[in-house]
Amino acid sequence: MKRKDIKRQIRKQLKYKHPHWKNMRKSAKKKLLREIADEVMNNYDCSQLMNVPLEELIGIESQVPTAGIRTLKEMAKYIENFHNDNLFILDSNRQFKDKLFDPELKFIDSLFDNAIINTLLAPTGYSPAHREVHPYQLFRMELLKAIKYPEISYRKFCTDEYFGQERQQNRAFVGLPPDTDDQIDHTELCHFRLGLSFRQIMNMMVYALHHFYQSGCLENAIIHGVDSSELPMETNYPLCTIKVNGKNVRIYTDPDCDCGKRRSKRDKSSYVIGYRMHTLTAINPSTGHSFPLLSIVGAANHHDSLFLTPLIKLAQSMGIEMKLITADQAYHDGDGEILKETGVHVIAPPSEKVNLPENVQEFPLRVTCNEHCNIPMKFIGKSSTGHEFACNAESCECMFETDCIKFRTIPSDSGYFQPMPTFLNQSEQAIKIRKHIERPFNLMKKREGLEQTRVRSQHGVIVRSAVTTIATLVLEMAGTRRKQSRKQDKQMDLFAAAG
């Protein structure tokens, strides 16, 4: 944690005391970073106790619940009353609707209300009468790129090739006049992303989630899951490296990113420089389909378990109700702190690093009272001290019946005895369904193009991940890219009839 605190202080000085340092030459950046790092190291007292919030240590202090983020219920009421307060409903994009032929774009155009998007994303002092380009147009451009053109750069996207007179459908979807050559420059999109606050991003997410919950893609009984995926940045070497307790602290061109480890992959390095996206998903138990709901973006070097509590709190502030989360071993809640703080059970596969308690057999799992007893005990519940087991022997079955206490408590751990024990049927089913969590990551990174972030800051990655999540949700709602069930082979029917 000391290394995280030192990196936090360096990052804070760069952002607030030198806001224009990104425009400096590389040699000047290195010199400035070395001066700041030396100053922080000389003034840092390792013996002093840290009183820094976890969110600041892991670099997500800008992604915490803030005032102004609406819940799902508040958003539903806001949408219901929005047009009731207006005498006339004017749709400036109505004249372009006959240009839309793509079923996906037609569905999205009918789903999102431009006036509501303007109120959610408009900057302070926004005046529609004095604007040629409105927030809803810029948001639609981001959405169009994620859905139709994820593989190209922003600079190429904002050209005649995609918004010229021959591209009437794209112009109609964004809201550009069909009879002019007016276009939106890529720098306007860049300024739009930089100008969005976290409150605006989350309110737009809540707006999309409101429509998603109304679409019927999920049932009443759902299980939530959490997993992470790396988002590499276009940087290879640190500008400055310092030693803290024998370990390196690296500062890159983007001070918020860092070097972390990832799972072994055949065609990729085991290390990645960039960010890691921690995503909350909703799983439909009857179909096994999972959908992304919300993400937090942090540096790749931090352990996954540090992001689980902030992610749950952010989801709860948006009105997402959770009871059970299934995740991998990196998100263990062995001490039960997450359950106490958020009221959400976290279930993960048992960790191989945790030793079994005394007098516990692993395969099949059974608990006995002591080393002399061979009769399995029954699980009766959980208390503040741990998991409680009682004797399950019949009368006169146990030879130690008169001297045995017939009761045992096993503390919680990250193995089989988690706050929600893994030997329960519900836990086993939740662990089995965890494999479906990987599907949204494959869609967001491969289909919607998030694997190449094409932005150069943490804030840009946050906006890109939010837009990509919304794009994934609307495509699932549209249902245009679902695989059709394979038709049965007629030759097999012939063989069955021949019998």
Predicted regions and their residues:
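Polybasic low-complexity intrinsically disordered regions
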Residues: 159, 190-339
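Amphipathic alpha-helical segments in structured regions that serve as interaction surfaces
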Residues: 3-21, 28-46, 53-56, 60-61
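Basic, amphipathic alpha-helical segments enriched in Lys/Arg and hydrophobic/aromatic residues
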Residues: 427-499
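Short alpha-helical "recognition helix" segments of helix-turn-helix
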Residues: 46-47, 157
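Dynamic "connector" segments at or just before major functional cores
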Residues: 4, 58, 64-138, 142-150, ...
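An internal, acidic/charged active-site-proximal segment
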Residues: 298, 302-395, 421
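Short amphipathic alpha-helical "interface-anchor" segments enriched in bulky aromatics
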Residues: 161-162, 329, 360-382, 411-458
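Short, positively charged, Gly/Tyr-enriched micro-motifs
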Residues: 130-205, 219, 459
